[in-house]
Amino acid sequence: MSRQIALLRGINVGGHNSFPKAAQLELAESLGLKDVSVLLQTGNIVFADPGTPPAETARVLHERIAADLGLTVPVVVRTAAELAAVVAANPFPQAAAEPKTLHVTFLSEVPADTSRLDALDPAAFAPDRYRLIGRELYLWCPGGIGRSKLAETVSRARLGVTATARNWNTVGKLLALAEA
């Protein structure tokens, strides 16, 4: 069975955008989504492919969350095959040994303007590194993302698209759920 994964940005982070796990499940099922699982409290919903393109699924979820909860929550959706490709394309395989140091920012589309990222001097942020591959921005911070100047700089780069990040542990768990 083909599956889709909805990634909601900014849910239950720092006490903002409260949207409990049970309510996420209920909302997804109320939209007619089937075989729904919610991973963690932070907006990771896995479900049977509803037969709509991922961008349409994202739009419907975004609009329903706004209508039902009054929250403006950006949503990015990937298919299970797309998520598997994200894992396979990891440009920092050495980071797999410490998955909390690797993050993937999922973008709604390929950014039209990457000049702010392109202008970054990698040496200025060593040992932290990033790589933009299609609609994913991989960020490896061996010393931890909380102390990373690169993470802060990249987050301010404003690529002009909807974006939400997950650490490698979460990416792996989402893929396992999507392939189950």
Where are these regions (language model features)?
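Surface-exposed, charge/polar-rich loops and edge strands
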Residues: 2-42, 46-180
